[in-house]
Amino acid sequence: GVRDGYIAQPHNCVYHCFPGSGGCDTLCKENGATQGSSCFILGRGTACWCKDLPDRVGVIVDGEKCH
């Protein structure tokens, strides 16, 4: 299946990006999502949000620190 979420690097770390750049859209589409955008997460900074991301691709788990 698919779901929306903040795409994760290994160890529950976000992909940082610059608002207004196409980086998140490209990253998300390369991983099978339909689109991507940058969103601000409190305590983590700007991160990539993907729409319709396949289940096989990791997303950020709430409450777990980047390590």
UniProtKB/Swiss-Prot annotation:
Disulfide bonds join 13-66, 17-39, 24-48, 28-50. Residues 3-67 form the LCN-type CS-alpha/beta domain. It is found in: Secreted. It holds the Pfam family Toxin_3. InterPro entries: LCN-type_CS_alpha_beta_dom, Scorpion_toxin-like, Scorpion_toxin-like_sf, Scorpion_toxinL/defensin. One of its GO terms (molecular function) is toxin activity. Expressed by the venom gland. GO terms for biological process: defense response. The keyword Translocase does not apply. One of its GO terms (cellular component) is extracellular region. Keywords: Disulfide bond, Ion channel impairing toxin, Neurotoxin, Secreted, Toxin, Voltage-gated sodium channel impairing toxin. Has the structural arrangement of an alpha-helix connected to antiparallel beta-sheets by disulfide bonds (CS-alpha/beta). Belongs to the long (4 C-C) scorpion toxin superfamily. Sodium channel inhibitor family. Alpha subfamily. Binds to sodium channels (Nav) and inhibits the inactivation of the activated channels, thereby blocking neuronal transmission. This is Neurotoxin Os3. It comes from Orthochirus scrobiculosus (Central Asian scorpion). The lineage of its organism: Eukaryota, Metazoa, Ecdysozoa, Arthropoda, Chelicerata.
